[in-house]
Amino acid sequence: MELNQLRCFVSVADELHFGRAAQKLGLMPASLSRHIRMLEESLGTRLMARTTRSVALTDDGLFLLEGAREILERTEVLQNRFQTSRQERVEILRIGAIDSAAAGLLPTLLHDFRQQCPEISTQLSEDKTIRLIPKLLSGGLDLAFIRAPDFVDPKLKTVFLFHETAVVAMSENHRLAHNTSVTIHDLADEPLIVPERRSRPHSHDLTMKLFIEAGLQARVAQLAEEKQTIVNLVAAEIGLAIVPQWTARLAVSGVRYVTLQTDAKEAMNKLPLSAAWLKGVRDPARDLIVSLLQSRISQYAENA
């Protein structure tokens, strides 16, 4: 017994005429008769008494009609339910990003991705690299933008994107605030606000190594973890801070951002940004955004 056979049976029962029922279903009368005959054979009983002039349901036909209507109605409800669910289901790409990428790269990238793939929604989580990597490994994220550590878990695929330029954040009242640029030597003996190495190793090491390369000792006045906190401390004239260029978008009152000039050999005045995802996981949405990113990487890097 098949659903199509039941639909044919109910249609004939409603019309009590094979020709009209066949027309209603879009079938040839001979094809409709064959479906009814196959249904009767599968049930082992006559469902209709047919003459050249009339069609009537047998007792078994009347019994089946009630159940057939219920089956078809339930089937339609289920089909509609899953069709609606399928239409409403939106693919979600879960993206994690360090604060630098969340404020710098991601707004432009996500805008471009939405233009290209409007049917895919994105969910953005901002965190530090040390917490984003475990989320990738556990399947909690599909893609992350991180500062790749020296040792990367072999289960992860990482792709270097570009370096983010570092600038010096200082109080607008500082003696160097109106300079167009400064060097590390200009910052000698200046109190510095530095991120903790445990949570931000790349940013911490950047400051320290720049001073070491210049033959100077960094004078750390304050350790802080969050970029917003660091910039607020700069505004309070606690010290200066070497931060990614995007930090200027925080627009904290009383803070100026000055270009940091370094010698050619000092390539460490930039912070590396990488994309990472779990190897061996098929994810078309992730692949689409990575492809878009790689195709426009030079454009995105210009503003880094």
Curated annotation (Swiss-Prot):
The keyword Transcription applies. It comes from the Bacteria. Residues 18-37 bind DNA. Gene3D superfamilies: Periplasmic binding protein-like II (3.40.190.10), Winged helix-like DNA-binding domain superfamily/Winged helix DNA-binding domain (1.10.10.10). Residues 1-58 form the HTH lysR-type domain. PANTHER family: HCA OPERON TRANSCRIPTIONAL ACTIVATOR HCAR (PTHR30346:SF0), TRANSCRIPTIONAL DUAL REGULATOR HCAR-RELATED (PTHR30346). This is HTH-type transcriptional regulator TtuA. It comes from Agrobacterium vitis (Rhizobium vitis).
